[in-house]
Amino acid sequence: MDILPNDRISKEKKMLNYVSVSGYGWTGSSACIDLLREFEGFGAIQGEFRIAKDPYGLRDLEESLVNNWDFVRQDIAIRDFLNFCKVLSRETSLFSRAGKDFSNKLNVDFMLESKLYIDKLIDMVYLGNTSVHRYYIPAYKNFFMKMKSKFGNGNAVPMYLARPSKSNFARETKNYINNLFSGYANLKKINTLILDQAI
């Protein structure tokens, strides 16, 4: 049996327990959450946490990296996931872009944790170019990119290559979710987190 040194034990993050409560419309999931909060060690974040099931979330990422792999698809899925995480991370106000403010709600650098998670999944980053990257750029930018190509200057951008196994994806995703919530759990002194509409 291996025994970890005391300093190693204190630095490791304890795995949390999760309870996912789902409903449809106003079917009462919040009442269920309020009831579960009454138990010792249970807590819930404010609002829904839908990173697993929303478009560009974890389910789409797994589908593209593990179940339906394609050379370009996996790069686009990672980009979409990181852009989605920007929305989840940033604050929102009346005159700003939409955001969910999870960096503040969870007491974590949401984007840093998301980038570290992706770093664990990818095999390499390389310079590449695909027309798919130009699908959503403005016409003027597309024009300049075409001109750049005409004069022999490439439009290569960093691209991701990731093909994790199902077990590796599951392990890293579990660690990622735990890293997102561990600061909040420590702050609130809870060991079981209730998530609304998570799956």
Task: List the predicted regions and their residue ranges.
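PAPS-dependent sulfotransferase catalytic core
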Residues: 1-179
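Conserved helicase/translocase P-loop NTPase motor core
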Residues: 171-199
